């Protein structure tokens, strides 16, 4: 029986910090069975008792306190609260399965990125070195976890190569 992971929000700890409060432990189901043999072969099988040892949840403390930081960029000084390492690819409205409108109704193109909403909330403002300011305004079938897709007006002439980069949530 697999253990579950629980998160406990901690308003006194910075939002980017997580720590394990309790390790998880899988549970067990133990069945005691009486097997009756006749001439050396199994003749009957009876369950005598079943015992369940419940799993112990893994508990992770997750900071929720926003601590603002500043950084100089070619666009000027920005204030951010979280730095994330992501794998950044690129797309435009002409890619297979794409169109002119994003998941939240914005026009696809430069300044709009596709994200996994479980990792980066839709409508979040983001700064991406080498790309600039953007809004998390789209999702995509291949965008899972720490992968983002940078929107361009024309991906063929964007000059962006897929790579790991640090981005900043504003």
Regions found by a protein language model. Name each.
Residues 58-170:
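Solvent-exposed, well-ordered loop and adjacent helix/strand elements within mature globular domains
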Residues 1-80, 142:
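Extracellular modular ligand-binding repeats in secreted and cell-surface proteins
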């Amino acid at each position: 029986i697999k253990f579950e992971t629980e998160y406990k929000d901690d308003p006194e700890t910075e939002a980017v910090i997580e720590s394990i409060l309790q390790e998880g432990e899988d549970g067990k189901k133990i069945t005691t069975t009486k097997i009756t043999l006749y001439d050396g072969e199994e003749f009957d099988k009876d369950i005598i008792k079943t015992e369940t040892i419940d799993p112990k949840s893994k508990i992770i403390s997750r900071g929720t306190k926003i601590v603002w930081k500043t950084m100089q960029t070619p666009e000027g000084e920005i204030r951010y609260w979280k730095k994330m390492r992501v794998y950044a690819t690129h797309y435009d409205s002409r890619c297979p399965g794409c169109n002119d409108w994003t998941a939240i109704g914005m026009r696809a193109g430069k300044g709009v990125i596709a994200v996994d909403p479980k990792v980066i909330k839709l409508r979040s403002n983001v700064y991406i070195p080498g790309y600039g300011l953007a809004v998390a305004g789209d999702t995509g079938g291949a965008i899972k976890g720490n992968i983002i897709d940078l929107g361009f007006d024309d991906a063929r002439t964007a000059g962006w190569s897929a790579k790991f980069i640090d981005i900043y949530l504003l």
